[in-house]
């Protein structure tokens, strides 16, 4: 053994003795090569994310205009984690959580941990304590813009507080990122949109809370309403586009189109029908949709209703879509029950 190798081995032993086993290792020795994920609750979004869902132990930012469906997208992720036996938490800084709507989306509100903090510092400290416990699988912070620093709350209305929120977020993310990775918690930060003043060229839109969240996020999703969905004269929902604007675990810039129905959330039938039609799993002839020469219905809404009533057929079609894109179902379910991840 060369002197260099002996010196390296000695240094590695010293590091492990000082900081614990696993504090340094060769990249190939890592037990987990493949990114462990949890489904987003939307098949179209799972495909757009490229790895079959949200990566565990990472920070996700979901941003977009008001009433575009940001909270709906995050509540579907909570419902999916709970369905797989995981623990979820919701930091409601906006004080606008609707338990009735959450329940309709499949969230078990009896098991969901909810905090409505008074200040930004309090909200982020609660989030840190939950992450460090190692017992929470997903935590949603709604929203970054509502995480108001204590100094701003205690000050007067006209006081200037330049950069306070950005500093708060920067400090919090420095502390949180390592703990999130170790505990395999998915941390979803919901954010709003602001306009930069005096921008002549380029996009004037920006997100509040400084640049730290943009850097620390593994995935950034932009949620925007595309068009209204009508049934007769009634508006029953919105067609929504979710664009993956940043992705460190798969190619970015993919777009998922979903129907967000009022009082129901993301329409599983709608996304399955659209994706199956694109892949020719479901055939579309004129206004008729058919599968294996069996007619599903005339028109998109009738076909969606047919799939809603025939869940076995719907899940069979979903299985073929997942198979085509190489996505396995419940990829993160076994991780939630693996206590070794919490060591």
From Swiss-Prot:
One Gene Ontology cellular component annotation held by this UniProt entry: cytosol
UniProt-listed GO biological process terms: DNA recombination; DNA repair; SOS response
Binding residue positions for ATP: 64-71
Subcellular location: Cytoplasm
Positions of transmembrane segments: none
Keyword DNA-binding belongs to the record: yes
PROSITE patterns found in the cross-reference section: RECA_1, RECA_2, RECA_3
Coiled coil segments of this chain: none
Pfam families in UniProt: RecA, RecA_C
GO molecular function, a single term: damaged DNA binding
HAMAP family, sorted: RecA
PANTHER family: MITOCHONDRIAL DNA REPAIR PROTEIN RECA HOMOLOG-RELATED (PTHR45900:SF1), RECA (PTHR45900)
Protein name: Protein RecA
Organism per entry: Bacillus cereus (strain ATCC 10987 / NRS 248)
Gene name of this polypeptide: recA
